[in-house]
């Protein structure tokens, strides 16, 4: 198991090379809210459009503006610094008296909407994200690229966790191993080491990285076998747009029809204590994919940390996928994804896209 494994492509070999995020405007993300504001309560709900500022920075800025602790700021998800993004924040103001909103507006940040709500905005409380991505310096046959995009829209893609989950050069996986009391030797084997004690936020980040790495490893096996979007005996099914899981159950025409219309998807493990939800052939693939020493160490560490077995869909279908050639070497993509899904998974099925924002060391930011 490598910290930064090369993922297989489900739709075949790369059909382009390109550059992404040469400027922030090339990567635009708008949150799709999960609810309408109540219009009452003591949490000021702000919709903020920002450029070159990540979520944590804006949260700190809002806390300073409101004169409250950062724990009084809520947001649904993290947005990257190297982008133009729109997202909601909640600001806890018990007296319902807000400072001057115009003080927040500058060239790189604007409050585009504000209202009141009766509770703090919780993590994950969004319907999804809409992306407008501009790829520049595109090299590839336009007709072949168009065909690949149509295939992605029709069939979907593997639901990879993106490289943002794993830190620079995949270092979060090695850090998770260290947290669990292991160190990797030069020959790749693991040796015992003192467990690292970390802040809760750091611990949570590394637990997520460990889980994500194991999931990607199972998905790699399914893609390589050509059954990432096909039923296996013992499959645990995930309902589209939810965390609900059912099965295993005998294959039927009803399941076939639901799979074909993307109502259900095969699922893979988010590792933790407890029995795998799947069985038979599906479980055999998962156990085989996670039988190497590093995977076993991550599995044991996640179980000891108190996480429970959960599932994640193996298949992802970008919603409303559309594209336009702005010129012979510039391709613009528009699509929406559910929470927790990565635009880079879409780009990977097209080819090698160099992220200009992550090439230089000083460009590191939260994802």
From Swiss-Prot:
<dbReference type="GO" id="GO:0009982">
    <property type="term" value="F:pseudouridine synthase activity"/>
</dbReference>
<dbReference type="InterPro" id="IPR050170">
    <property type="entry name" value="TruD_pseudoU_synthase"/>
</dbReference>
<dbReference type="GO" id="GO:0160150">
    <property type="term" value="F:tRNA pseudouridine(13) synthase activity"/>
</dbReference>
<dbReference type="InterPro" id="IPR011760">
    <property type="entry name" value="PsdUridine_synth_TruD_insert"/>
</dbReference>
<feature type="active site" description="Nucleophile">
    <location>
        <position position="80"/>
    </location>
</feature>
<dbReference type="InterPro" id="IPR020119">
    <property type="entry name" value="PsdUridine_synth_TruD_CS"/>
</dbReference>
<dbReference type="Pfam" id="PF01142">
    <property type="entry name" value="TruD"/>
</dbReference>
<protein>
    <recommendedName>
        <fullName>tRNA pseudouridine synthase D</fullName>
        <ecNumber>5.4.99.27</ecNumber>
    </recommendedName>
</protein>
<keyword id="KW-0819">tRNA processing</keyword>
<dbReference type="GO" id="GO:0003723">
    <property type="term" value="F:RNA binding"/>
</dbReference>
<dbReference type="GO" id="GO:0001522">
    <property type="term" value="P:pseudouridine synthesis"/>
</dbReference>
<feature type="domain" description="TRUD">
    <location>
        <begin position="156"/>
        <end position="316"/>
    </location>
</feature>
<keyword id="KW-0413">Isomerase</keyword>
<dbReference type="InterPro" id="IPR001656">
    <property type="entry name" value="PsdUridine_synth_TruD"/>
</dbReference>
<dbReference type="InterPro" id="IPR043165">
    <property type="entry name" value="TruD_insert_sf"/>
</dbReference>
<comment type="similarity">
    <text>Belongs to the pseudouridine synthase TruD family.</text>
</comment>
<dbReference type="GO" id="GO:0031119">
    <property type="term" value="P:tRNA pseudouridine synthesis"/>
</dbReference>
<dbReference type="InterPro" id="IPR042214">
    <property type="entry name" value="TruD_catalytic"/>
</dbReference>
<dbReference type="GO" id="GO:0005829">
    <property type="term" value="C:cytosol"/>
</dbReference>
<comment type="function">
    <text>Responsible for synthesis of pseudouridine from uracil-13 in transfer RNAs.</text>
</comment>
<dbReference type="InterPro" id="IPR020103">
    <property type="entry name" value="PsdUridine_synth_cat_dom_sf"/>
</dbReference>
